[in-house]
Amino acid sequence: INSICLLPKKQGFCRARFPRFYYNSSTRRCEMFYYGGCGGNANNFNTLEECEKVCLGYGEAWKAP
């Protein structure tokens, strides 16, 4: 698994509420959270699909030719 995906969820220290996705290593799933807009870490994806591609290996390889 990509080491980025093992980082804890970090909402950041600003007060915005951007819906983002992170990989939860306890549940082994990508889950939604609200990102504050600054700070945080790399376990922070714009879409569920992006999170699953990086952390679960889903994506291009799973698409039909």
From Swiss-Prot:
The organism's place on the tree of life at top rank: Eukaryota
Pfam families membership: Kunitz_BPTI
Domain BPTI/Kunitz inhibitor: 5-55
Keywords: Disulfide bond, Ion channel impairing toxin, Nematocyst, Potassium channel impairing toxin, Protease inhibitor, Secreted, Serine protease inhibitor, Toxin, Voltage-gated potassium channel impairing toxin
One cellular component (GO) term of this entry: nematocyst
InterPro entries reported in the protein's UniProt record: Kunitz_BPTI, Kunitz_BPTI_sf, Prtase_inh_Kunz-CS, TFPI/VKTCI-like
GO molecular function: potassium channel inhibitor activity; serine-type endopeptidase inhibitor activity; toxin activity
SUPFAM superfamilies in the cross-refs: BPTI-like
Subcellular location: Secreted; Nematocyst
Disulfide topology: C5-C55, C14-C38, C30-C51
PROSITE patterns: BPTI_KUNITZ_1, BPTI_KUNITZ_2
Site (Reactive bond): R15, A16
Its biological purpose: Dual-function toxin that inhibits both serine proteases (trypsin Kd=124 nM) and voltage-gated potassium channels rKv1.1/KCNA1 (IC(50)=0.9 nM). The activity on the Kv1.1/KCNA1 is selective and reversible. The toxin presumably acts by blocking the channel pore in the open state.
Cross-referenced PANTHER family: KUNITZ-TYPE PROTEASE INHIBITOR-RELATED, SERINE PEPTIDASE INHIBITOR, KUNITZ TYPE, 3
Further comment: Negative results: does not inhibit voltage-gated potassium channels Kv1.2/KCNA2, Kv1.3/KCNA3, Kv1.4/KCNA4, Kv1.5/KCNA5, Kv1.6/KCNA6, Kv2.1/KCNB1, Kv3.1/KCNC1, Kv4.2/KCND2, Kv4.3/KCND3, hERG, Shaker, HCN1, HCN2 and voltage-gated sodium channels Nav1.2/SCN2A, Nav1.3/SCN3A, Nav1.4/SCN4A, Nav1.5/SCN5A, Nav1.6/SCN8A, Nav1.7/SCN9A, Nav1.8/SCN10A and the insect channel DmNav1.
Family: Belongs to the venom Kunitz-type family. Sea anemone type 2 potassium channel toxin subfamily.
Name of the protein: KappaPI-actitoxin-Ael3a
Species per Swiss-Prot/TrEMBL record: Anthopleura elegantissima (Green aggregating anemone)
